[in-house]
Amino acid sequence: MASRKAGTRGKVAATKQAQRGSSNVFSMFEQAQIQEFKEAFSCIDQNRDGIICKADLRETYSQLGKVSVPEEELDAMLQEGKGPINFTVFLTLFGEKLNGTDPEEAILSAFRMFDPSGKGVVNKDEFKQLLLTQADKFSPAEVEQMFALTPMDLAGNIDYKSLCYIITHGDEKEE
């Protein structure tokens, strides 16, 4: 009888610890942020089974115009979860990344996906199309407002390095 109680206490303690662990993840973010992460998770979870798998990642990349993602890259992404990537794991991964990442570098990395030549610019028209049609779609007015503040080169391409600086440090012209 005593061993049964001890076993039950152990299970209860483990359950409480798991709940505490997952609740800590949710306490790292505001409710609005959690909702945005939930929307992002839903966009990636293409088959709507509550778990992000390799096929989900491949389809997400495909929708973003990147069709030849190496298997190793997809495997590496999935291995970061150390098991099935449900929403709680997804949120935990973002929490870990956001707490240890330089925001400017994270933004630059995202832009580099659209700059295969590494010139530091992205095509304005292609980027505009992505903003209007993918994930959290921008309205045409929002895109124009953003482009009004966006540094462009002479060819009309977005200088994303300067844009990242403005996003993370503010516009040096502002006073």
Swiss-Prot record:
Residues the record lists as binding Ca(2+): D45, N47, D49, D56
GO CC entries: A band; cytoplasm; cytosol; dendritic spine; myofibril; myosin complex
Domain EF-hand positions: 32-67, 102-137, 138-173
Record's miscellaneous remark: This chain binds calcium.
SMART domains: EFh
One Pfam match: EF-hand_5
Keywords: Acetylation, Calcium, Metal-binding, Motor protein, Muscle protein, Myosin, Phosphoprotein, Repeat
Any one Gene Ontology molecular-function term assigned to this protein's record: calcium ion binding
The protein, known as: Myosin regulatory light chain 2, atrial isoform
Modified residues (N-acetylalanine): A2
BP-aspect Gene Ontology terms: cardiac muscle tissue development; heart contraction
Superkingdom of the source species: Eukaryota
Transmembrane residue ranges: none
